[in-house]
């Protein structure tokens, strides 16, 4: 695999998907920068996970303040008075959905990237396992890519390595990169803020575990 000599920025939460994307990016770009967001999330330990992973692998890391999002979009990830849905509702999106989150994350990262002369931005969204979140869809990413290019008169390229793969294949990607244990033990995907295997009860933990078991069944025989 040839290495792109350009720089790239990863939208990095410290969770399974974005950490997998971080290593995907390290395989493809000469220099990688990680950007995380503090939006008053209850599972703020994910930011500590992000710091630790970046420190361990000598990756430049920035945390941007997006606390205003908590005031604008009530949801179970930022409000202590709202419990996380254990199961996705039949109609509508789960209460863990944060309106505008991915749009704002990618927009702020794009502003950050342009100031540094960087075009490539990587995000871990997936339409295969998107839990009903509209801002994880491929059509949204493609639309935003065009909008950002027009808004800033700049040629951004939004990469979505996980867009069309499920959690089992995401685990397989980590295995192929030699970072399976890091993803399994050092990331935080749980909506209740528990590192590694998580609480086992929230939708994120259930999806992660289901994917891991499928990965073991398909690829670890």
UniProtKB/Swiss-Prot annotation:
Its EC number is 6.3.4.20. SUPFAM superfamilies: Adenine nucleotide alpha hydrolases-like. GO terms for biological process: queuosine biosynthetic process. The keyword Metal-binding applies. It catalyses: 7-carboxy-7-deazaguanine + NH4(+) + ATP = 7-cyano-7-deazaguanine + ADP + phosphate + H2O + H(+). CDD domains: QueC-like (cd01995). Keywords: ATP-binding, Ligase, Metal-binding, Nucleotide-binding, Queuosine biosynthesis, Zinc. Binds 1 zinc ion per subunit. It is an enzyme of class 6 (ligase). Pathway: Purine metabolism; 7-cyano-7-deazaguanine biosynthesis. Zn(2+) binds at residues 190, 199, 202, 205. ATP binds at residues 12-22. InterPro entries: QueC, Rossmann-like_a/b/a_fold. Its cofactor is Zn(2+). GO terms for molecular function: ATP binding; ligase activity, forming carbon-nitrogen bonds; zinc ion binding. Catalyzes the ATP-dependent conversion of 7-carboxy-7-deazaguanine (CDG) to 7-cyano-7-deazaguanine (preQ(0)). Belongs to the QueC family. Homodimer. PANTHER family: 7-CYANO-7-DEAZAGUANINE SYNTHASE. NCBIfam families: 7-cyano-7-deazaguanine synthase QueC. HAMAP family: QueC (MF_01633). This is 7-cyano-7-deazaguanine synthase.
């Amino acid at each position: 695999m040839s290495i792109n000599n350009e720089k790239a920025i990863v939208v990095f939460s410290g969770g399974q998907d974005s950490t997998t994307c971080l290593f995907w990016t390290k395989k493809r770009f000469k220099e990688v920068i990680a950007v995380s967001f503090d939006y008053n999330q209850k599972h703020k330990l994910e930011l500590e996970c992000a710091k630790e992973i970046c420190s361990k692998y000598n990756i430049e890391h920035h945390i941007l303040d997006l606390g205003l999002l908590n005031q604008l979009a009530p949801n179970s990830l930022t409000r202590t008075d709202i419990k996380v849905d254990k199961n996705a509702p039949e109609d509508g999106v789960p209460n863990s959905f944060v309106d505008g989150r991915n749009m704002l994350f990618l927009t702020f990262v794009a502003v950050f990237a342009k100031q540094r002369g960087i075009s490539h931005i990587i995000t871990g969204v997936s339409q295969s396992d998107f839990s009903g979140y509209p801002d994880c869809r491929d059509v949204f990413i493609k639309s935003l890519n065009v909008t950002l290019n027009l808004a800033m008169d700049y040629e951004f390229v939004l990469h979505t390595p996980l867009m069309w793969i499920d959690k089992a294949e995401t685990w397989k990607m980590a295995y192929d990169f030699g970072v399976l244990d890091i993803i399994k033990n050092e990331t935080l995907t749980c909506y209740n803020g528990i590192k590694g295997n998580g609480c086992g009860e929230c939708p994120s933990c259930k999806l992660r575990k289901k994917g891991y078991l499928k990965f073991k069944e398909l690829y670890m025989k």
